[in-house]
Amino acid sequence: MMGRKNSKQVRYSNRLILINRLSQLSDPLICQILSHLPIKEVVTTSVLSTRWKNIWLSVPSLELIYSIFPNFNTFRSFGDRFFDSTRVSCIHNLKLYFDEHDACYLTSWINAFVTRNIRRLYVRRVRGNYFHELPLSLYVCETLVSLKLFHLTLVDPEFVSLPCLKIMHLNYVWFPNDATFERLVSSCPVLEDLKIDVLWNDGRVYRVKSRSLKRLRLLRSSTMVFDSVPGVVIDAPLICYLRINDRVSETYILNDLESNAKLDIHLDFGSEDFGEPSVSSRRSRIRSFLPAISKVMGLKISENTFKVIHHYSNLAQLPQFDNTSRLHVTLRVSELKWLPNFLECCPNLKSLIVAFNGDFEKMGSEEMNQISFLLRMKRIVDMTIFMYTSKVLLHSDNINQLSFSSVPKCLLSSLQFVELNAQILRFDGEILNLAKYFLENSSILQKLTLHPNKYGSTYANMLHKFRRRSRTCQFILTDLE
């Protein structure tokens, strides 16, 4: 018993020593330390001494989450006290989460942020369907560097001045009209990073005009607006990275892209059918889009976009992708026969990644069921599985169904790295034939990478027996990450 009492006294004594040492620090330094603690722990420091009573109100960084408070009134009362616009201390970083309750306090709180020189602001409406409006003061914040908004409404301002804003992420944010978004972006003279996740009921045209923008990501997966023609217009000559995942927009206009830019495009051109008739009806839009992407060094193309480009190539000549040195394309096994035609347009390609959306169109259901059954048999040794799958795949007619009639220029002069991004046991004969095609026809190929799974390594090693045109070519087997 005496030992426990002494132990408590030692711990209490150590706490006093720590508090005394902290108290010797300046208020700004204490606030900086407190800003790294959860808000509940920050507030509890107010009971340490008279000096500490109000120090927590001056911390420069805060994460305020409505759900940690017992009720809405407590949450609002805390915020009203902390976001007092008469305080002179700065609020550098703030994350604010709130729910569907009346958010009339937002105006006064945000006005306080702006007055107290906010630098990084993250505001998220977590629950509810009402999109609360943000006040006009946010549009004229002279110190704001990063702005990230979720499920909110931006009103239409007459004037915007955000001279320091470099990062802006707008996730499911509602704009009253097209001009509001365009004015917001164009009024940020040093903006470098822009991310837009578009609402499902937003059918507007997004115009991004910026002389400073370097990174742009736009996601629009669906829409329920049928009386508009959504689109995307990008005029940002300094962009280094552009990712568009858009299943809705019918028009895409890209102006003056940098040649060293990297593009990641998942575009459907507003179509649900990717056959040649559908592509033909959008021919002029596709024709105006392709020259812009043909100028970039790095290009990643989704399966649907690849289909659109292929069917367009049957209607008109594709532009030459002379600057493209890195290509990542996703397709189905049944679409492999289209790949060489596109590679013909990339004469200087150095690196190629082919990712596969799994389909077993060429393999009968009986064969697939037999393979699945064997893979579930715990007592079957790896070699038995290898021998059976090899018999099904390598000795089927599939291995001869893929025929490339030509060798693109890039294989003879520039292609150095190829990766076939799929699990080996999901390969049918066509993918094996593709690996063989690259090995036998690439003059300066340095590395061909495949991804075997647990039972596929022995099977993949058979590819080592294929003839290699490039003497320096390495064959790499590695797990998919």
From Swiss-Prot:
LRR repeats: 123-151, 173-198, 328-356
Matching Pfam families: F-box, FBD, LRR_At5g56370
Family annotation (SUPFAM superfamilies): F-box domain (SSF81383), RNI-like (SSF52047)
Domain of life: Eukaryota
Domain FBD: 401-452
Domain F-box, chain residue ranges per copy: 19-69
Keywords tagged on the record: Leucine-rich repeat, Repeat
InterPro entries: F-box-like_dom_sf, F-box_AtFBL13-like, F-box_dom, FBD, FBL13/AtMIF1-like, LRR_dom_sf, LRR_FXL15/At3g58940/PEG3-like
Listed PANTHER family: F-BOX/RNI SUPERFAMILY PROTEIN-RELATED, FBD DOMAIN-CONTAINING PROTEIN
Name of the featured protein: Putative F-box/FBD/LRR-repeat protein At5g25850
